Amino acid sequence: MKHPRKLTTRAAALLLALLLLGTAGLTACDKGNDPSDTDPADATTQAPESGGDLTLPDGTTPADPEAPTDPAETDKPSTPEAPDSLIGDGSPLAEVYPTFSEVGGLYTARAKTVEITAPEGYTVRYTTDGSVPTKRSTEYKDAIKITADKGEGMTIRAACFDADGKLTGQVITHTYISAKAEAGLHYTVMLSCDEDDLKAMYRDVHAKVERAAHAEILAPDGTRIISQDVGLRLFGGSSRALSQKSFKIIARKDGYFGDEPYVGLGTFTYPFFPERTVIAGKNAGKVLEKYDGLILRNGGNDALLSTAADPDRPTLLRDGIANEFIAKYAPNVQMSYAHFAVVYLNGEYYGILELRENQNEDYIKRLYGVDDNDVVVVKSELDTTRACGDHRNAGECRFCGSWFFYETDSEAAAQKEMKDWIALCKKAAGAVNASEAEYRKIFAEVESKLDIRNALEYMAAACYLVNTDWPHNNIRVWRYTGAPMDGIAITDGKWRFATRDMDFTMNRYDKGAPLPEIETTPTVDTFKWVLSNYVEGYGDHQQYNDALYLQGLFPFLMRDDAFRADFAELCRTLASEEANAYLTELYQTAYDQAYPIMGDHIDRWSGYAHGMISDARSWRKAAQRIETFIKARPAQFLKHLDKMLAMYE
């Protein structure tokens, strides 16, 4: 699907700068009442398929496809004696479906020929535009010859029709891309969706719209690991305004899309992130292999199309690097792993997106072996249309707190949990300067309801990495609400922080940005972000209102001697040579993975945003600013830390 090119004027860019202060909200699509945050039953997908003359890492041709998955292992009715076939997700859902001679994936030949067969008495009809075949679609008669320019391809969706023209059984989807596998570098994600459905999502990017689609995912070595029908939604907050969208793909169960001919497996089964191991429960220590949904993110404020401020600095690297740094040095904070994915939409190259974990209730369920019905997630949201009425310029309302608020699931129990969280933070903020007796009383209450070590690590990491889109925004907390379980620490019922949108970090914005408060250079004193509204002498410019009460929680906790000592120790660890070397390693790894594919990404989107990075050399220069930050940050951070600690001496 071709997107209209729209060059953004400078005035519009400044407006977008206000919008991009946070990519967290603006829509119910990414809130706790998201229907994607359901509890699909566990299911399995077919073992990785291979076939035809697709290229494997060793240069050989793939083996014959494996038989469909045992129905007992899926969320589907049994079909007697389902034949071996290349039916996409491998599920013997229906007795009648077309068989492809070649499995979708990457190919290097100049052309590929695909034959499709059907059981006797049935006609095959197919489409190449991503839509579901109908009785008016092209009838298959001869082999389909696929010729595509390098990096492009063709999506074929086929189905069987009976003598009355009725679609029977599963729609089978295979996408063929003219490209070679680059082992270890990135996933390949091929999405197929009706063009009208895509237009409906793009027409109102903030509407709560989900459409049926098909997802094929290839491992970095080119092996086809996923092929199944999914729910497709736009994802993110203000970054939805960018030409390249972020998507959420959801492993829906059978019947979710009503009478439409889609098959739901309920789970994506593959270890997408080998670093991710289950933390507790019966699968503790094992690599996580089941996901209910996945995110394909455009990078938010670090997207190359995010040009409203400092358009020569985005890289698509920051969020992933920051989260992995937190995984090692703030291990009690729930974070999101990510890998680069080259994405195709209906066979057309769509550029690079980050394939990420979706940090919802299902994420907690998978990590800790608990019931997701006993997990509540509360997130801050951003709505730039909310105004206080006291400012002539609505953009100034960001400072009075009108824009920022908490959201969670609409159910009464979740709403009560959210109110309890707000009340706890508000009580702490109100006790920053309380008498010692009153402070100790309230600290004991906070300590009984909040994982103190988790909060300490979360705040230290955000300050070190210079996340200036926080703590007034981009907050995610969660709590287990069920009965305690032996051996599972998080069932103590305490609130815990998780990362959210770490793209606003590590030298993304310079001092000369249109909005001075978003500066993220290595010299920034981020302690002012959590102290300026509560401690005299911090913050010499207009500062965000503490509408979410997290700014007050920090000085409240810092008043405790033990917390302050542990916080200082972790901060010095973050600024240590060892941590600095690790952060440098993370940067170099991400750079090495992105650079070989960044040129095509830039070519795909160049011209869609005013001032966007136009070539690989410019991107390399932007990426080097992260390296500059990593080198300069430790000394600056320790200086600010010592200044802050001196207040408590």
PLM regions and their residue ranges:
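Conserved ATP-binding subdomain of kinase catalytic cores across diverse folds
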Residues: 207-397
